[in-house]
Amino acid sequence: MEAGPVSAVVGRFAPSPSGRLHLGNLACSLLAWLSARSWGGRIVLRIEDLDAERCPRKYADQLEEDLGWLGLFWDEGGSKGGPHEPYYQSECSGIYTESYKKLEAMGLVYPCFCSRSQLHAASAPHTSDGNVVYPGTCRGLTAEEIAEKRKKKAPAYRLMVPDENITFTDGCMGEHTENLLRDCGDFYLRRADGVFAYQLAVVVDDARMGVTEVVRGADLLSSTARQLYLYRLLGLPAPKFAHCPLLLASDGRRLSKRDGDQSLENLRARYTAEDIVGRLAYAYGLQEEPAPRTPESLIKDFSWDKVPKKDICLPEGLF
């Protein structure tokens, strides 16, 4: 049998399996799925388990079961496999090393010996995702200074960025500009223990998996300028981005995996899959009432124009 034409639109789920999914994860997954499917697109499931100790495989397996239960089916990746293996970031170190060495050969990578406490003590500005804008403390170290510091501590490695504005149009949030040096700062490519950093890993993986659109939470909006810079340096095609508003608890707190009541494990005991999908669709402006819906039934009317731009407080009693 001949394979059908490959869709030009490829979206992705890219969860970090450090615990059970919560409503915020589910909302982002639903929007990513609807955005790709509304264009007849495909979905890739990639497991972002860079920190393998915090992300046991049992959570990844449970995550797949949860997504399937909700009706958010994917076309390749995870345990299903496919043409772009591996789909688990913990298995991709060799792939990341190739790109890392390219950046190193450009003279843009340098060792950093700063501790987290030192960075916070420096009173440097913070990015919108809570990270400290690196003040460049180790950028100009001499070879002798580096050798001396290595005797006491293994370094992490950062990418040197220019004083340059990066502007892009976000599918949900509209036009956004960040200055690489002032708003982001030189950022980590590799931790001191050898684990590659999120920014490099997602760029390499999205490119090699043919991802054309990235839908994720607004807390990652500030990562986009850094990633676009990496795409350019590595000569890789950049996807389009859409950052969806975060789902907050009714008291305004950001939902996390510590919010047990809003974990899918507990929600599945109280609601059907259609109940959960329909209520999330209502919260995100995709329907006028919290009626039960399947993901499939929401595709034809999906539009980013309906999705709010500001974070969403979960209406009292919705879940």
Please report, for each region that a protein language model flagged, where it lies by residue.
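N-terminal Rossmann-like or analogous alpha/beta NTP/dinucleotide-binding catalytic cores
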Residues: E2-S123, T127, A218-D219, S223-L236
